[in-house]
Amino acid sequence: VPYTLTRRYVIGVNLNIQEFKQFIKEHIHALEPSGKENPLKVQKRFQLTPREYLSFAENELNNSSDVSRINCVSHLKRALDCQLDTYFHTFNLYELFNKRAIKVKTKLEFIGALGFLNSRSLVRLNNIRNGMEHDYVVPDIADIEVYFDLITALVQLLEHGAFEAAGCDFGIYSDTSCSDFNELIIKYDQHNTSIHVQIKAGEEENNITFTTSAETNIEDFAYMFKVLRMLNLLWDCQWGHEFVLRELEIT
């Protein structure tokens, strides 16, 4: 059975996530941007948008009455829910998450796993959200303003994230190491809600493939979704190699 010279990847078979992480670690400095997939296109699903709910919330925030504060929190909750569902709709995850009755807290954890929120921001957002939405009190104006800023920032991040490329290609070139591989391709399959990786070798029969599906393993899917996002940013030269490795927890 043929092997690469950098590590004993068995050519012609599928990788698991740990093996793929090792592959990225060993080849990331040899990746050269090649091609990109277009962002996904979908039809608008909801009549109102997150931005409109934010506008409603801002109008209420300008009024200091108790009713306006309570209404403001309600609009912010809808802005958050609508933005999460809009983002999931883009990637054809909305129906899957609905079918599984996934709650907002879990949706936020999923978004955090994709790299949109760090753990501290996620905890802070959930703590404020729980206090605002579940306690029978008139919320403090300072807390509302913090909540408003957090929701606005997340809406902006997910709006931008919905227009990220649905895939990217890299050539594999290195003067310092010998590798049997010459191309890395990662793509999002909107129809099957899965992420497909292909690592091309010199001979087609020696190509390595790796696919993870939201339907079968949501944790692995979330990680590979983050890989796709990080490699897109690497392709755009927005982030460096070492930062991508840290974000993907590859040591």
Q: Which residues fall in each region the model found?
A:
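Short, charged/polar, low-complexity loop and linker segments
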Residues: F56-N63, I102-T106, E133-H134
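Charge-enriched, short contiguous segments at helix-coil
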Residues: Q43-F46, G112, L117-C168
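Charged alpha-helical initiation segments
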Residues: V10-R69, F163-G167, S179, Q238-T251
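N-terminal accessory interaction module
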Residues: I172-L248
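Short, charged amphipathic alpha-helical segments flanked by flexible coils
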Residues: F88-L117
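Amphipathic, well-ordered alpha-helical segments in soluble domains
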Residues: T49-F56, H75, C82, S121-I128
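Short, hydrophobic, well-ordered secondary-structure elements
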Residues: E58, S68-H89
